[in-house]
Amino acid sequence: MTATRLVRAHPESSHRWVPAAAGWIVGVIATLSLLASVSPLVRSIIRVPREFVDDYIFNFPDTSFAWAFVLALLAAALAARKRIAWWILTGYMVAAAVWNVTGLLDGDRWFEDVGEIIGLGFHLAAIASLLLARREFWARVRPGALVKAAVTLVAGLGVGTLIGWGLLELFPGTLARPDRFWYALNRVGAFAGADAGAFSGHPHVLVNALLGLFGAMALMIAAVVLFQSQRADNALTGEDESAIRGLLELYGKNDSLGYFATRRDKAVVFAPNGRAAITYRVEVGVCLASGDPVGDPKAWPQAIEAWLTLCETYGWAPGVMGASATGAQAFRQAGLHALQLGDEAILHPDDFRLSGPEMRAVRQAVTRARRAGVAVRFRRHRELSPDEMAEVIAHADAWRDTEDERGFSMALGRLGDPADADCLLVEAVQNGTQVVAMLSLVPWGSNGVSLDLMRRAPQSPNGTIELMVSELCLQSESIGISRISLNFAMFRSAFEQGAQLGAGPVARLWRWLLVFFSRWWQLETLYRSNMKYQPEWVPRYACYEDARLVPRVGVASVIAEGFLVLPFSRRHDQPHTGHHIAAPGDLIATGRLHSDGTAPDRIGPVGDGADDDAAPRLPEQVRVRMAKLSALQDRGVDAYPVGSPPSHTIAEAIAAEEGTEVTVSGRVLRARDYGGVLFGQLRDWSAETQVALDNSALLDGTTTDFTRTVDLGDLIEVTGTMGHTRSGSWSVLVTRWRLIGKCLRPLPDKWKGLTDQEARVRARYVDLAVNTDARELIKARSAILHAIRETLVGKGFLEVETPILQQIHGGANARPFLTHINAYDLDLYLRIAPELYLKRLCVGGVERVFELGRAFRNEGVDFSHNPEFTLLEAYQAHADYTVWIDGCRELIQNAAMAANGSHVFFRPREDGVLEPVDISGRWAVKTVHGAVSEALGEHIDVDTDLATLRRLCDKAGIPYLTHWDAGAVVLEMYEHLVEDQTTEPTFYKDFPTSVSPLTRPHRSIPGVAERWDLVAWGVELGTAYSELTDPVEQRRRLQEQSLLAAGGDPEAMELDEDFLQAMEYAMPPTGGLGMGVDRVVMLITGRSIRETLPFPLAKPR
């Protein structure tokens, strides 16, 4: 992927090898020159080839630290494709070629001519290769860097030459006085370019070495100045910081380290549209980005591309430190590689507790601090006076345990700046007056904070830090925070794995090394200080371009974090020292940015096309309607006024006598403009009617005003009289109208409506607005629910509400939904049935009770199943399951009468047309074993053994599990052979006892339970039981269910001890009914369950 990016910026050519080859050749000469300068042995071994290379090809003195250093810098610059290195090497090759040509013209000895010819051939080949590969040296140096380094080099060489001249005057050896200055100049300033034989005599060896060292020192100082000039540009301008703060206002919640992007010893590069940015430092040739890009994640790729282009431009190696998983993935997609660097410790105050064995150490530390009289106070930085902030800064400096402030990706590096007013200060105060410790945390979005600074006085009581962190979590609600980042611990996994029992030798060695270096860098201390709070560990990554660059990226990270301090480095709090604004010109032109670095005047998308990118692209019709709305507001028209009730519904207006004045409101579905006369179709919940607008009858405005203002779908209110138009249509003859709701999105086709079923589910509000059938369905559902309630209440049943959130998964065999309550740190279930609570009411003496409410089952979704559904459960004391056969039939028939006007279900024919099916009268009743026998053509009953049942299943092609008992196998046969094949409503009774854990055994038939299921057209509508009231037997059955649940069965019920204790107080003989109301509505209306529900669950888009 990296190669792809480079090829895109610089097309592939046959000369891409030249920079690396040139760097290797010069690097080898530099290495040999260095070795020869320190080792007489090496100098002796390479004397002959060195002299040939020195005479005819390339300057190669016998001893010169300075020249070795020069060549090393040149080799690195060539490999980095620096354009300035190309100029230097090409110029040198041209000069050397001219020197050889001159030697050929003056030479009179053949062996000298041969050497010069070889050298000239090499130079010409090198010059040709360099010229052809010129475009491969694209990397530039920072503006001004070369001039500063050159001036420093000239000054250093001058000073070194003068000092060397003085040493030669004091210790000349055999060197003649007239040659001493020129010898010093040659050794220091010319890097021993002239042969030593050109001078009369020679100095002492030590003085000669010192002269070479002076030249090397001048070069090294120049290199430091070169690097320092790069670091001096590691600085934000005020406008850049202002732009970054604007991005943080919008997207700061994405990254806990985002606020540290405002650190002012970083530079920044923006995406072209200004909606994302990357902050970075340049250290030892590595452009080191910190954390994730700041801003809109959709613009991260553009920001990363701009950053990588900058790296290529200057020949820097790209590196990233502290990226999140999301950020690392974005960098990987741009061609970098990711390596886990450590883990960030995140505390969630809602889950934080001091109780529990794992928090014992923290709890004890907090107790000690409180006993020592330590209290904690919280203040935002803006709440501190200048004197108080000065005191805070003084404490921070006095309590720092290092000479310089450390940090790059996890530290802000400043205190007391007015721009950081939202930072949070946590102080530990002993005895009410003395501050003994402090935490400073920067904002993490609007509801989080990220640790920036932690200080404690040497005399602070033990446990002070633990007390501050704990109080921060416990008082988080009053502070307005819901997440806290303690920043990340580097190499956390290495500490954990190396300390585990059975850790391998490599893991233990790696941990030992980290512990050793922790004496200086506090790696283990940071890990352990965070670990004790039981945080959530979130991985952080380092990113690099090539594995060979990992050491360089590591060194750059160590320098940037302050663990290794280079000469002339500046890491103290600074004002804005950047010279060039990096923010895009379009963003600067808005005038929003501030030169003092404070947040922009108006927070929002910026840059070319940013407004369009910030939200989904709006369709043309929506943009037209938005423009109309804007024009209305400009004219002072309220498109969404306060409501006033109309005098009539549309249905009432249609029924009114001619000439009746009415005020109706509704949605405009159609409009026809005939020039001066306009007709529209207006619909409210009750009906639809025509409205007629005539310029001659309108009291205010004209029909043109109407067409200019109103679109199809708008809500309007009209006032007029009922009458006939010229064509005889019964209409509202409008005299006044007003807009009461502007529809910003167009309605679907006026004749077809929403034809896609998925669209109808997702946009039910639109479906209801335009589809009469959808309105009739919701009316039918309401009528069915009302009829069920009315029937039960008419029989003396009491309606109740029981908990939806339940601690025990029980009441039915089904897979539940799991949730969690933070207040009690407790897992809860969404109820799968209200049964167990309703039975508690029965124990308490409520003899007729029902609940019509929502239940939840984490199971499949199809035409007859929805995870959230409406369930009726009813219980009648002193009754049994036979009572509910007539009771259930009456409920459903009454519901059908309420919805359809007669006792009918609607069923689709083969052509899709719905036809009524009569359900009046009594319904069939069959036993389960009898129905299965009828379907099999072979008799079975409760005494049929398991082997026979399995054989019959194999014969019928019905699958079963080996651990099922006979009852479970019969139930599976019933579901496949009977339930799925049933058409007209039928009650199937007397189910096997083993599959009915809450049902009493049959009073006369052993092995079956008094239970029936009502099935119609393959759909189970309801079930009823003679309830099991024996608490001993009930406990035994639930214990069996709980064993199944413990064994991994997700549908088995858990043991509800509170319910069993309630049953031990005795429940009267009771018959219970459970009915799926959604399925009843489905069969009554002839539609699928998704059509009958106003808002069924739909997959995310």
UniProtKB/Swiss-Prot annotation:
Organism per entry: Mycolicibacterium gilvum (strain PYR-GCK)
InterPro entries in UniProt: Aa-tRNA-synt_II, aa-tRNA-synth_II, aa-tRNA-synth_II/BPL/LPL, LPG_synthase_C, Lys-tRNA-ligase_II, Lys-tRNA-ligase_II_N, Lys-tRNA-synth_II_C, NA-bd_OB-fold
The keyword Transmembrane helix is assigned to this record: yes
EC number per UniProt: 6.1.1.6, 2.3.2.3
TM stretches of this protein: 18-38, 60-80, 84-104, 113-133, 151-171, 183-200, 207-227
Gene3D superfamilies linked to this entry: Bira Bifunctional Protein, Domain 2, Nucleic acid-binding proteins
Name of the protein: Lysylphosphatidylglycerol biosynthesis bifunctional protein LysX
Binding residue positions for Mg(2+) 1: D1013, E1020
Phylogenetic placement of the source organism: Bacteria, Bacillati, Actinomycetota, Actinomycetes, Mycobacteriales
Chain intervals for the UniProt region annotation (Lysine--tRNA ligase): 602-1101
Membrane disposition: Multi-pass membrane protein
Location in or out of the cell: Cell membrane
Function per UniProt: Catalyzes the production of L-lysyl-tRNA(Lys)transfer and the transfer of a lysyl group from L-lysyl-tRNA(Lys) to membrane-bound phosphatidylglycerol (PG), which produces lysylphosphatidylglycerol (LPG), one of the components of the bacterial membrane with a positive net charge. LPG synthesis contributes to the resistance to cationic antimicrobial peptides (CAMPs) and likely protects M.tuberculosis against the CAMPs produced by competiting microorganisms (bacteriocins).
